[in-house]
Amino acid sequence: NVNDTEHYVALRNLADKLDEKYDLQGNRIYYLAMAPRFFGTIAAHLKSEKLITDHGYNRLIIEKPFGRDLKTAKELNDDISAAFSEDQIYRIDHYLGKEAIESIAALRFGNQIVSSLWNKEHIDNIQITLAESLGVEERAGYYETAGALRDMVQNHILQIISLLTMEKPSKYTASELRDRKVEALQNIKVYSKEEALQNFVRGQYGEDADHTQSDYRHEEGTDEQSQIETFVSGKLETENKTLAGVPIYVRTGKRLARKSTQINVVFKNVDTNIFDSTDADSNLLDQNVLTLYIEPDQGYRLDLNVKDGGQTYGIMPIHLDYHKTAAEKAKIPEAYEKLIHDALDGNRTNFAHWHEVAQAWRIVDVIREAWDSEKADFPNYVSGSMGPQASQDLLKRDHRNWIFDATN
């Protein structure tokens, strides 16, 4: 019982015995995987009942969600900070523990060919897709209080964006990475209500085409008139000098055509196709695309244009692929395994700092408030599709298309 002082006393006695038995030198990690409303209470009791040692380290690992908006997140952070300092708090986001996410920095800053092209002069747009084929399953109760915007965009997607848009750190250290990521998130434009409605799309899944899968509103534990979104897509903009003007398209959803998390970096097309004598717009070359596969596959793909090998000088697209083998993937620790190991080591590189969390809420809160002001016409996409038509229209408005489409 998190409200019962005697339970904390019993826990302290047990911890002291284990400390003495295994010579732990007062080192303790507390892992909080429960409703956020209990975080402050637990932190206060850990301090008042003297579970926080005065020798060794004391660390607090906290699972998401970290609040429901900026206001509740700040209240939560204030409560926890009364007992633990910022350098003792480890806000865990399992996406940051994924090998492919951690490799973004290596790709960007470890390859001159990539880093020299990673700018607004060469990149046309960036696309981030976190697609899930399953519905809400047993998480309906949680989803009714969260939705895809809070569950996926506020943390996972914005963390990925910070890694894709941050300036180069002077060193790959926790403090340097934190500062660059905070700057990156501060450079993401916070929309007005009108801009949010114009640039973000929400969806809720209906039945599949064969009527074998139920719609969201008939899942166990959901409201039959629910306004909770199971799909989000949108356009974000960064105001940093390197990528200013490059649109960042994001989407995430449940019950989509195929499970896939990937990042598509779409490069600008060549000005003219010198290999075509007609000069027709329809004969433009395919754009170069660098794809980062996060899950379930892990790897990279680069789309290039080359001569087709025929008698005439025709051009054809090719794909340079690298995918980790089963043997390679077997050596990679699971995300939580890696992050807990990092916490034991005191390595905060892949944990979210409070300033990152706060700025992410500032970006998301406006979108949530805009949606709450208007009733959505749900359900608005078929299970097994790639989301509502409005998501496709969002890019077509800018004369672009989603690179990943599992329905083709």
Regions found by a protein language model. Name each.
Residues 1-62, 66-408:
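Secretory/organelle targeting and membrane-embedding segments
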